[in-house]
């Protein structure tokens, strides 16, 4: 697992149109020691924030108005490019097999269904961030 000192350097972008969901996710992340957290209620701003913030992990809701998580997942995956790995974790209340398959096919690295177990969620976040760090180290 990652050393605690590495947590403060990791940047997390959380995109969800529900303020209560953002608050819960941020509370769990902050409790785990993450401090570089950006949140977005409006998925239309996600590409701009992604490019400016350069996150190490994106946490993305699927069911949002106007621009849904699937369309955004596709856009963000194309922005990362082939020579970079920015994992995307999907957070969704949709437990259908179709939703999971579609999100994974579009590039999601993990899927967590709401409501989620906070301990499991924290472990999954840490695992994806460790993957990101290993990828960055390998590129050096």
What are these regions (language model features)?
Residues 20, 42-45, 63, 68-74:
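Acidic catalytic/metal-coordinating carboxylates
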Residues 19-38:
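Two-component/phosphorelay signaling modules centered on CheY-like receiver
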Residues 39-57:
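Acidic, metal-coordinating helix/loop segments flanking the phosphotransfer/catalytic sites
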Residues 39, 65-66, 92, 96, ...:
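The feature encodes the CheY-like receiver
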Residues 23-27, 71, 84, 95-110:
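Alpha4 helix (beta4-alpha4-beta5 surface) of REC/receiver domains from two-component response regulators
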Residues 98, 116-129:
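C-terminal output helix
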Residues 16, 61, 92:
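Active-site residues of response regulator receiver
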Residues 48, 70-83:
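Short amphipathic alpha-helix used as the core "switch/output" element in two-component signaling
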């Amino acid at each position: 697992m990652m050393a605690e000192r590495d947590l403060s350097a990791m940047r997390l972008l959380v995109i969800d149109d529900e303020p209560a969901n953002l608050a819960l996710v941020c509370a769990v992340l902050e409790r785990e020691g993450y401090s570089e957290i950006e949140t977005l209620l409006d998925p239309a701003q996600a590409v701009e924030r992604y490019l400016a913030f350069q996150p190490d992990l994106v946490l993305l809701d699927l069911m949002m108005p106007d621009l849904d998580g699937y369309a955004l997942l596709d856009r963000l995956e194309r922005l990362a490019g082939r020579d970079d790995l920015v994992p995307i974790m999907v957070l969704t209340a949709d437990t259908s097999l179709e939703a999971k398959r579609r999100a994974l096919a579009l590039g999601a690295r993990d899927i967590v269904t709401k409501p989620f177990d906070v301990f499991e969620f924290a472990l999954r976040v840490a695992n994806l961030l460790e993957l990101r760090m290993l990828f960055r180290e390998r590129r050096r």
